[in-house]
From Swiss-Prot:
Gene Ontology terms: biological process: ribosomal small subunit assembly; translation
Signal peptide interval: none
Origin species: Dehalococcoides mccartyi (strain ATCC BAA-2266 / KCTC 15142 / 195) (Dehalococcoides ethenogenes (strain 195))
Protein name: Small ribosomal subunit protein uS19
Species lineage: Bacteria, Bacillati, Chloroflexota, Dehalococcoidia, Dehalococcoidales
Annotated gene: rpsS
Keywords: Ribonucleoprotein, Ribosomal protein, RNA-binding, rRNA-binding
GO function terms (MF aspect): rRNA binding; structural constituent of ribosome
Family statement drawn from the similarity comment of this UniProt entry: Belongs to the universal ribosomal protein uS19 family.
Length: 93
């Protein structure tokens, strides 16, 4: 479900300060953030953002197609390692 237009986009103030500084100085370093709920704005296009997945910061390069989505949509928080394999038993009749 999308957010109400009346409320505006969900933005983290600390992240937006870091983005403004990075875009003004053409900084190419990764901006670390824990705000997975924050919406990607056009100001972030071309920046590298490290989004926390619960264990580490996953680097993401922001493109124009990502504008309007949340940062957390581009990192997975769960790793599927596969189901346990059943042992093969020879059937002799």
């Amino acid at each position: 479900m999308s957010r109400s237009v009346k409320k505006g986009p969900a933005l983290c103030p600390k992240l937006m300060k870091k983005v403004e500084v990075a875009s003004a100085t053409n900084q190419k370093s990764i901006i670390k953030t824990w705000a997975r709920w924050s919406t990607i704005t056009p100001l972030m296009v071309g920046l590298n953002v490290g989004v926390h997945d619960g264990r580490r910061h996953v680097p993401i390069y922001i493109t124009e197609n990502m504008v309007g989505h949340r940062l957390g949509e581009f990192t997975t928080t769960r790793n599927f390692r596969g189901h346990a394999k059943a042992e093969k038993v020879s059937q002799v009749k």
